[in-house]
């Protein structure tokens, strides 16, 4: 059985790790881009940075994630109609010969085509870059077709 001193020490370490993890996205910066908020996402060692404009219902985002394998791709999607993958509208990026390619696609099944296609809402300023740690960052601005401030991602 652990002594109370060992338990306090263990809880202190866990607390420090949680604080470090939750502050992680706040330490990230992007070339000449600033975002009002960020969150470390619970999977894929990824983070989402965003600024929401209530004036025109637009969302300016930076999504950072490592590809699952060398030469792989990353994607961030929102589902404007329900929870779940099917029906999602995705921003996808991959690196080809040192250049990041970013495109949009609709996820209409569990085996999506990953073809370039327009989304159900306007998206502009699509861009991407790689970080020194080999993560891929997707930049985009999108206009949300609904007026609520909560989205399913």
Q: Residue locations for each model-derived region?
A:
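Extracellular-facing/secreted segment signature in eukaryotic proteins
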Residues: 2-153
């Amino acid at each position: 059985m652990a002594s109370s001193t060992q338990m306090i020490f263990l809880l202190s370490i866990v607390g420090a790790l949680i604080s470090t993890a939750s502050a992680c996205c706040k330490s990230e910066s992007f070339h000449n881009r600033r975002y009002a908020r960020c969150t470390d996402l619970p999977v894929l060692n990824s983070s989402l940075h965003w600024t929401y404009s209530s004036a025109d219902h637009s969302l300016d985002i930076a999504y950072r994630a490592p590809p699952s394998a060398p030469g792989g791709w990353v994607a961030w999607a929102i589902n404007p109609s329900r929870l779940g993958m099917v029906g999602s509208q995705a921003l996808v990026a991959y690196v080809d010969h040192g250049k990041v390619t970013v495109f949009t696609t609709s996820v209409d099944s569990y085996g999506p085509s990953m073809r370039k296609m327009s989304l159900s809402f306007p998206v502009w300023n699509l861009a991407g870059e790689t970080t020194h740690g080999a993560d891929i960052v997707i930049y985009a601005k999108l206009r949300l077709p609904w007026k609520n401030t909560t989205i399913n991602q």
